Regions:
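Active-site neighborhood segments
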Residues: 32, 36, 40, 45-246, ...
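Conserved, non-catalytic sequence blocks in retroelement Pol enzymes and Pol-derived host proteins
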Residues: 33-36, 99-102, 131-135, 161-163, ...
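Extended serine/threonine- and charged-residue-rich low-complexity intrinsically disordered regions
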Residues: 99, 237, 251-254, 262, ...
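Metal-ion-coordinating, acidic/His-rich active-site neighborhoods
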Residues: 170-174, 191-337
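Short amphipathic alpha-helical "interface-anchor" segments enriched in bulky aromatics
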Residues: 295-305, 311, 633-662
């Protein structure tokens, strides 16, 4: 029989200590993803009794008590986060994404991104909320508006970071209007930040699987769901060496016996050393792909190249099997040329993979997830693709027709041209509409070479970019040893990836903030763009970037300048004019206000643009130190530096939520899941503390 718990006022244990222990117990449950009933376990209760029997009698340990304490803590700590948002130095930027949970709920994750009063970049989970109804833009917008109002940030929402779905474009059109009726369509488009990670994902998938990558992956998943093993093998085999390797890896991992056989052949002692690739989502459960499979494909290729000898030995060892089902199909065996193609693919994908890893962070120091890295990174990758494009430029249309992998997008005439190997692709919005699809016209406009300017990067970032895995194609390529059809396959893949990258590079021009993030970086400034965009047609891009930042600055930060300067003017007028007539005072103020409007805001920007590059490793700190010189511009700059490059926080939170919703906890409600995940995020990232009391 469980002893009756004493009333709190009868206990010798301080109330503050009891409350702290309750908070710590909830913190343990939340952070460790254990059941709410964990403290009801007989062995755990016996263990606690050994240390403090009085404590065991005093604290409510039941699962229902933990659930009530979770609700109380969530409400209390949410007020702490609200205060942090109110005190932020910047506007509150949002990122959001959707997820299907293991218990089949549609869940929306919403994060707030800002710079706190300590000048630190912060990210806080605001909601992990069930999304009812269709995923239309209007429906998503209603959820976002409700969340913003719940958190009392409706009037301070800045930009929104999300993936590139058209529904998200419509969502923002519906979302901003209720929050700010003065918003125009162009204003909304300027605040629509495309997730860099999603762009990189689309580029890599286009390179690997062609222009219809999503359909290819979906067909593979349907084959697996229906148990159509042979059809799936043929489906992947049609993708050439990558598909063949996929089938080999799947064969090895299809049974423990085959995995052990491979391990013996590889003579590895540690499992991590012989594992070829991470399990993909589709291989673990029947759900739609989360669009990150290209990373596992890259890692599969990278590991296979290192284990090439072992793989070939494994295939050779199976050739003596009488049962054909126990052998790898002859059509899937990789030739020497196939292995060389995989080497080329690995070299081309590596910089994309490293860019993804670099920019999915939380803005450490001067990089790793800041907005300025998006445009810089895309310039870097465009040069990378153009280097390989030029190196494979001798592949003719006739050679391309020999390629056996015809499901990829054909190479166009403009892409095959080699007269301008280093030319930067022109933004589609710069061409007359009648030339949008004329690749030959586009190629003829590229008369000047434009190269990624590494010398103007900050020294601490320059080393990382120079060593990020991008080597000249001529130094690492095995092109000359490949037959024509394999060269054509790689050439087509390069074209597919380059086109997708060029498509989203052009879309960056829809918002002035991508270029503004570089211009407002004291280490870069406008000079970086001028040194990078040097071709004749690119000079207009520099002018656009400069005009865009001026227009955005004038529209959204003039009110703040006027408030500061008019307050100073009014105070001065009162001191010097005394009781003079009001009409005269108003006349003076109107003339002064007009002068401020003619110079005012843009004078700050003009003064900043005239500065030499600044030797600083922390742009946020630099702007904080120069607030008095640039009161309005510093506010703009801090707002820009608070914008993340990716919406990767949402993906991370989905992964954490999946650890909470184990097969034994699928009955957990969406509201409880939200409380658990929000508290976990706030505690882990320093937003709140649990278990504080005077005696601790």
């Amino acid at each position: 029989m469980t002893p009756k718990r004493r009333r709190l006022e009868q206990s010798v244990i301080p109330k503050a200590k009891v409350r702290a222990i309750q908070e710590l117990s909830v913190g343990f449950v939340v952070d460790s993803d254990v059941p709410f009933t964990i403290f009801e376990h007989s062995f755990l209760r016996s263990l606690f009794n050994q240390f403090d029997h009085e404590l065991m009698l005093q604290i409510p340990w039941s699962g229902s008590s933990i659930a009530r304490e979770l609700q109380r803590l969530f409400d209390t700590k949410r007020d702490v986060i609200k205060a942090e948002l109110r005190d932020a130095l910047t506007t509150i930027h949002l990122s959001f994404d959707l997820w299907t949970s293991p218990n089949r709920f549609a869940i929306m994750a919403v994060f707030a991104h800002f710079i706190d009063r300590g000048a630190r970049q912060q990210s806080r989970l605001l909601a992990l909320r069930r999304q009812f109804g269709t995923h239309s833009g209007e429906n998503l917008a209603a959820s976002l508006v409700g969340i913003a109002q719940d958190w009392e940030i409706g009037g301070r929402v800045g930009c929104v970071v999300s993936d590139n779905l058209a529904a998200n474009d419509h969502c923002l059109q519906y979302m901003y209007k209720p929050l700010d009726s003065s918003m125009r369509p162009a204003d909304i488009k300027a605040r629509r930040m495309r997730c860099y990670g999603h762009i990189l994902n689309l580029v890599a998938r286009a390179f690997l699987f062609g222009k219809d990558a999503e359909s290819f992956e979906l067909e593979s998943e349907i084959n697996c769901m229906r148990g159509l093993a042979e059809q799936d093998l043929s489906h992947w085999r049609a993708k050439g060496p990558i598909g063949k390797l996929h089938n080999i890896v799947k064969f090895i991992r299809s049974s423990p016996q085959r995995s052990e056989h491979f391990k013996r052949i590889a003579q590895e002692e540690e499992y991590e050393e012989y594992r070829l690739c991470e399990e993909s989502t589709a291989e673990l459960e029947v759900i739609l792909n989360n669009e990150t499979r290209w990373n596992s494909t890259y890692m599969m290729i990278e590991r296979a190249l290192r284990k090439r000898t072992d793989i070939r030995a494994f295939i050779f060892a199976l050739e003596g099997e009488q049962d054909e089902a126990k052998r790898i199909p002859a059509d899937d065996i990789l030739s020497n040329e196939d292995w060389r193609v995989l080497g080329e693919v690995n070299a081309i994908l590596k910089p994309i993979y490293l860019q993804t890893m670099r920019t999915q962070g939380w803005g450490k120091a001067d990089g790793h997830g800041r907005l300025w890295e998006v445009l810089v990174g895309m310039e870097y990758l465009l040069e990378h693709f153009e280097d390989w494009k030029a190196f494979y430029g001798d592949v003719t249309t006739q050679t391309m027709s020999l390629a056996s992998f015809v499901d990829l997008e054909p190479v166009d005439a403009g892409f095959i041209r080699t007269d301008s190997p280093g030319g930067r692709p022109d933004r589609a919005r710069r061409l007359p509409a009648r030339f949008d699809d004329d690749e030959v016209y586009v190629a003829r406009q590229r008369t000047q070479t434009s190269r990624f300017t590494e010398s103007v990067l900050p020294e601490h970032s320059r080393t990382e970019y120079l060593t990020m895995g991008k080597s000249p194609a001529s130094e690492i390529s095995q092109k000359n040893t490949l037959p024509a059809d394999h060269r054509g396959f790689i050439r087509t893949s390069i074209n597919n990836g380059w086109k997708k990258l060029d498509e989203y590079y052009s879309k960056l021009g829809e918002s002035p903030l991508f270029a503004a993030a570089i211009i407002l970086h004291p280490r870069f400034g406008l000079g970086w763009l001028e040194a990078t965009w040097v071709a004749e047609e690119q000079l207009a891009w520099v002018r656009d970037a400069k005009a865009g930042i001026k227009d955005y600055f004038s529209r959204w930060y003039s009110r703040e300048r006027e408030r500061h300067e008019e307050t100073g003017l009014d105070n001065s007028a009162r001191r010097t004019m005394g009781q003079e007539d009001d009409q005269y005072t108003q006349w003076i103020n109107s003339k002064t206000k007009k002068a401020l409007e003619m110079g005012g805001n843009n004078s700050e920007l003009d003064r900043y643009l005239r500065l030499e590059p600044q030797d600083t490793q922390d742009p946020i700190q630099w702007w904080r130190e120069h607030t008095s010189s640039f009161p309005s511009l510093s506010s703009f700059a801090l707002d820009v530096f608070a914008i993340p490059a990716m919406a990767s926080d949402c993906e991370r939170q989905f992964s954490l939520a999946k650890l909470t919703l184990t097969s034994q906890r699928l009955s957990m409600s969406a509201d409880t899941l939200e409380r658990v995940q929000c508290l976990k995020n706030w505690v882990r990232h320093g937003g709140v503390k649990l278990g504080n009391w005077p005696g601790s």
